[in-house]
């Protein structure tokens, strides 16, 4: 029991800064929406539309680079720290290549925006302008993620938290300057949010790079050889590990976007109730997602040390802590669901629907916690292909079709409306949780030599 208690302390010490960093990131999006809304409703809508395209594109790159964390954690655990700098260099090369692709996609996103049904031309122009300003921040964001993954792979999660809050503090005044046109800058409205956010990502990257260069604990792994050429073997391995994570993230984000589109014709009350429940559950998702990042670090580190039993302990502890957190947040959601809904909207119909959906969200949180921590465990074991196949099957083969059937057809029961999609979420996430656990069990039952050989690749 003592080893689980000790492991839980170490996991929480890693996870809490990640949680706070994620809060800062979420707050940046909230600040952009509020400040753009203060300028005009059209500008706020433009930021919302632009963000809905930015997120799938940038999260694809973000997911690709997540491969660095278990690689660095494993090298750190095995005492091969001299190889970390080379892995990080290749991470920067990969981030550079991916950022070019992301920028090309975002530059041409105007075709998607202008093809939206009945979109106002002025709104479309502002959304395109917002994206074309924001895309210059894509390299800064991805380079920052490489530096952050280096720190987190070395079990240092506090720098990411500090840089997250630095970004938030810089974002507010820079937003103000470019939205309203102060200090000789042009008045850009919602487009100014894109300029500010792009600038903030570069500030966060430069600050993180400065920390890495001056941190005593990283003296032995600094890049003293210059940038060097791309190493095709290392980059291929990072892509093999990262691509399944990137695709899983992409399909998860697009699933919720597709459901939002399918709910939109059902009416304002249904859309608002669905959005409130989804927004609140996404805030709660920060907890297990951050814990999953900590579990990846601990499992990778323990495998690097050559201890498959300690890696199992880290995995089981992460699941136990995650389930406890999910039960607490589920009870909180059920108990205060009406009060939470009233914080978003005071329309009685919207509040009633949101409160009903939050009952389903409480169940969803438990399944979601297990599946996301399961994904973190599999990343630690460098078993990333299974993450993609499990999430794709669970979300797109099981979750979305069953949600569609329950919500919009009479095939099984009378049309359930938004609640049907939430039942689909529960089916999809519960399936993912079960499949992740089965895969984890299969991996852990393999001989130690095979597990360690896979981890050392």
From Swiss-Prot:
Keywords: Antiport, Cell inner membrane, Cell membrane, Ion transport, Membrane, Sodium, Sodium transport, Transmembrane, Transmembrane helix, Transport. It comes from the Bacteria. GO terms for cellular component: plasma membrane. Its main location: membrane. InterPro entries: MATE_fam (IPR002528), MATE_MdtK (IPR050222), MdtK-like (IPR048279), Multidrug-R_MdtK (IPR022913). It is found in: Cell inner membrane. GO terms for biological process: sodium ion transport; xenobiotic transmembrane transport. GO terms for molecular function: antiporter activity; xenobiotic transmembrane transporter activity. It holds the Pfam family MatE. The chain crosses the membrane at residues 11-31, 53-73, 93-113, 127-147, 160-180, 188-208, 243-263, 276-296, 314-334, 350-370, 387-407, 418-438. It is a multi-pass membrane protein. HAMAP family: MdtK. Belongs to the multi antimicrobial extrusion (MATE) (TC 2.A.66.1) family. MdtK subfamily. Multidrug efflux pump that functions probably as a Na(+)/drug antiporter. This is Multidrug resistance protein MdtK. It comes from Salmonella enteritidis PT4 (strain P125109).
């Amino acid at each position: 029991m003592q080893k689980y208690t000790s492991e839980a302390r170490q996991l929480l010490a890693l996870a809490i800064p990640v949680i706070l960093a994620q809060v800062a990131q979420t707050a940046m999006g909230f600040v952009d929406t509020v400040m753009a809304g203060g300028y005009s409703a059209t500008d706020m809508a433009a930021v919302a539309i632009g963000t809905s395209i930015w997120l799938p594109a940038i999260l694809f790159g973000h997911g690709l680079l997540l491969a660095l964390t278990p690689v660095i954690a494993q090298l750190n655990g095995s005492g091969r720290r001299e190889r970390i700098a080379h892995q990080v260099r290749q991470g920067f090369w990969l981030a550079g290549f991916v950022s070019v692709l992301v920028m090309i996609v975002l530059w041409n996103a105007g075709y998607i925006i202008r093809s939206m049904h009945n979109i106002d031309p002025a709104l479309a122009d502002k959304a395109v302008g917002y994206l074309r300003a924001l895309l210059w921040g894509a390299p800064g964001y991805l380079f920052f993620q490489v530096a952050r993954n280096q720190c987190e792979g070395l079990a240092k999660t506090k720098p990411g938290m500090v840089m997250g809050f630095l970004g938030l503090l810089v974002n507010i005044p820079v937003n103000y300057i470019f939205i309203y046109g102060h200090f000789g800058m042009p008045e850009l409205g919602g487009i100014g949010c894109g300029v500010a956010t792009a600038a903030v990502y570069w500030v966060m990257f430069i600050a993180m790079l400065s920390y890495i260069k001056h941190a005593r604990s990283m003296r032995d792994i600094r890049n003293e050889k210059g940038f060097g050429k791309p190493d095709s073997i290392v980059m291929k391995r990072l892509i093999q590990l990262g691509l399944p994570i990137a695709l899983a993230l992409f399909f998860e984000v697009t699933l919720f976007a597709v459901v939002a589109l399918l709910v939109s014709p059902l009416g304002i009350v249904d859309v608002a109730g669905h959005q409130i429940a989804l927004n609140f559950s996404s805030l709660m998702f920060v907890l297990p997602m951050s814990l999953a990042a900590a579990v990846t670090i601990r499992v990778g580190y323990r495998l690097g040390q050559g201890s498959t039993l300690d890696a199992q302990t880290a995995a089981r502890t992460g699941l136990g802590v995650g389930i406890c957190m999910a039960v607490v947040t589920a009870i909180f959601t059920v108990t205060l669901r009406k009060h939470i809904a009233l914080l978003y909207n005071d329309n009685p119909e919207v509040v009633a629907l949101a409160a009903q959906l939050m009952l389903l969200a409480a169940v969803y949180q438990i399944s979601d916690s297990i599946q996301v921590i399961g994904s973190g465990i599999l990343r630690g074991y460098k078993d990333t292909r299974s993450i993609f196949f499990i999430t794709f099957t669970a979300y797109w083969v099981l979750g979305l079709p069953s949600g569609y059937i329950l919500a919009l057809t009479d095939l099984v029961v009378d049309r359930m409306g938004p609640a049907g999609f939430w039942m689909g979420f529960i089916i999809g996430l519960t399936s993912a949780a079960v499949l992740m656990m089965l895969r984890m069990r299969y991996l852990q039952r393999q001989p130690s030599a095979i597990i360690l050989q896979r981890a050392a690749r």
